[in-house]
């Protein structure tokens, strides 16, 4: 469950939790990462709403897949002049901005799977992983997780 504030990962069998973990890397952290990246690389201050819009419009869990996506025009305040400024940002840059968060989520999934018994791990291979929450809508996240976990 990739929510706003936390990502909760669990292996569930027969209605009970076999192994789980919760990390404070989720949708809000993705937004913060975008804000920081734009500030650092473009000298542009953007707000949370703009970061969330970028996340929904062009963000991808994969830098490679993001190369195929369109760029986005955003507005903010130029940190050098203090004046309003409009820039074009590539989807690839947004994907780069959020890679640390994506990798933390993948690490949590892998660690949870590593704590799972062989029988339940076999069930996970057969039935797959279920992604829920708003953060699960991040483009290419299922493919990136499948590649990292081989599930």
Regions found by a protein language model. Name each.
Residues 1, 34, 109, 131:
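Residue-level signature of catalytic and energy-coupling elements of molecular machines
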Residues 1-17, 66, 139:
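Gly/Thr-rich phosphate-binding beta-strand-loop-beta motif of the actin/hexokinase/Hsp70
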Residues 1-2, 11-13, 74-78, 133:
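Flexible glycine-/small-residue-rich
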Residues 6-11, 45, 73, 130:
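Structured core elements
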Residues 14-99:
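Phosphate-binding glycine-rich/basic clefts of nucleotide- and phosphate-handling proteins
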Residues 16-18, 122-127, 149-151:
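Short, surface-exposed connector motifs at secondary-structure boundaries
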Residues 97-124:
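Phosphate/ATP-binding catalytic cores across multiple sugar-kinase/actin-like superfamilies
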Residues 121-145:
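Glycine-rich phosphate-binding loops at beta-strand->alpha-helix junctions
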């Amino acid at each position: 469950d990739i929510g706003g504030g936390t990502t909760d990962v669990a292996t569930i069998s027969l209605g009970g939790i076999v192994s789980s973990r919760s990390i404070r890397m989720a949708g809000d952290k993705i937004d913060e990462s975008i804000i920081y990246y734009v500030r650092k690389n473009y000298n542009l201050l953007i707000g949370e709403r703009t970061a969330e819009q970028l996340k929904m419009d062009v963000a991808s869990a994969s830098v490679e897949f993001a190369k195929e996506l369109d760029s986005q025009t955003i507005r903010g305040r130029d940190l050098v002049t203090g004046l309003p400024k409009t820039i074009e940002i590539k989807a690839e840059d947004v994907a780069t901005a959020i890679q640390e968060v994506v990798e933390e989520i993948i690490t949590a999934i892998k660690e949870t799977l590593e704590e799972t018994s062989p029988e339940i791990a076999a069930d996970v291979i057969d039935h797959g992983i279920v992604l829920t929450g708003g953060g699960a809508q991040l483009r290419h996240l299922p493919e990136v997780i499948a590649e990292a976990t081989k599930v």
